[in-house]
Amino acid sequence: MSIEIKNTGVKKVVLAYSGGLDTSAIIPWLKENYDNCEIIAFCADVGQGEEELVGLTEKALASGASECHIVDLKEEFVKEYIYPTIASGAIYEGTYLLGTSMARPIIAKAQVEVARKVGADALCHGCTGKGNDQVRFEGCFAALAPDLKVIAPWREWTMQSREDLLAYLAERDIKTSASATKIYSRDANAFHISHEGGELEDPWNEPSKGVWTLTAAPEDAPNKPEYVSLEVEHGRITKVNGEALTPYAALMTLNAIAAPHGVGRIDITENRLVGMKSRGCYETPGGTVMFAALRAIEELVLDKTSRNWREQVAAQMAHLVYDGRWFTPLCKSLLAASESLAESVNGEVVVKLYKGQATAVKKRSPNSLYSEAFATFGEDQVYDQKHAEGFIRLYSLASRIRALNANDVKSK
């Protein structure tokens, strides 16, 4: 079932390996089509779960890899990618918190680092030719290792289905736990899990309960709300319910607290980078709580023009992250702008979790620009309401002149 491809002198390839059906088939395919090159399997631990890593090395070696490198990226992923992204306010098309997108640059970077370490001359990924990830990975490779060849089997081989891949492995006596009846395509990390395919391909189908794996259905969530306290320093979550935690530990703690309340579910039809629309269901419990907490503090501390600028940064950042442009000058610039704005994003927030909702119900900050003395509707001693008259006259001056000009024209 494999096609003949002219060897280009590749001797050692680092493959982004998950142990799933696709990458299990890629290992023997590379050997057969790239002159029996050496395959180094690489797996990034970004918090997808210990169960996904059990037996991974043995599986890779059994498939024909000479080595398997499992790199723990969990803490770095949250600290250096998730925290800066949510601090920027980035949210794609108004709903998607970019869980999959944020993971791609750190995985690509670590894959390049392994390639340099073992002296590889090529990188390989198992992304399909229809998806965003091929662009994200290869864009990062281009920025970090333009000298390394990139191999994308899904754009080269003749196999088109799970059945084809299973038959390919069976012909070579390579064992796999995969079956032809897999319903959904899922991708998990510490921040979220995504679900695509199966019944979700028809937008008229409501997602069944079998789609969701991380969060409770909101209607089945507890009838009593739960309150969680978050402390924020410079746009980063530092404490949860009074306990100082590392970024990864804070996210895991919030996942465990928010998931039973059905927080963080979305069902969207998004515009893919490659031009088509796709439907995905995403579960992001802890990230949703973090996002709500940061926005609540921003309401207190950012003035109007700063808030408007942050929204512009967020919109640009969302597209850069989604499109795989993390390692670009513009992304670096936007992250610096976000970091500057986050200097005053300090304080404490209490978030109410109830039936799928995460609502900031209490907030305070030492940098707050909100003054109860000025904002009160009751009697106060600090604000002279007569001062508003001059401001209004100047604020509306352009409108006044425009109207006077129009009246002058009419009278002629």
Curated annotation (Swiss-Prot):
GO MF assignments: argininosuccinate synthase activity; ATP binding
EC number: 6.3.4.5
Catalysed reactions listed for this entry: L-citrulline + L-aspartate + ATP = 2-(N(omega)-L-arginino)succinate + AMP + diphosphate + H(+)
Residues where L-citrulline binds: 96, 101, 132, 136, 185, 194, 270, 282
List of residues binding ATP: 16-24, 44, 126
One GO biological process term: L-arginine biosynthetic process
GO CC terms in record: cytoplasm
Pathway: Amino-acid biosynthesis; L-arginine biosynthesis; L-arginine from L-ornithine and carbamoyl phosphate: step 2/3
Residue sites binding L-aspartate per the record: 128, 132-133
The UniProt record lists the keyword Nucleus: no
Compartments reported by the entry: Cytoplasm
Keywords: Amino-acid biosynthesis, Arginine biosynthesis, ATP-binding, Cytoplasm, Ligase, Nucleotide-binding
Keyword Amino-acid biosynthesis attached: yes
CDD domains xrefs: ASS
Oligomer and partners: Homotetramer.
Sequence similarity: Belongs to the argininosuccinate synthase family. Type 1 subfamily.
Family annotation (PANTHER family): ARGININOSUCCINATE SYNTHASE
Name of this protein: Argininosuccinate synthase
Source organism of this protein record: Shewanella baltica (strain OS195)
Gene: argG
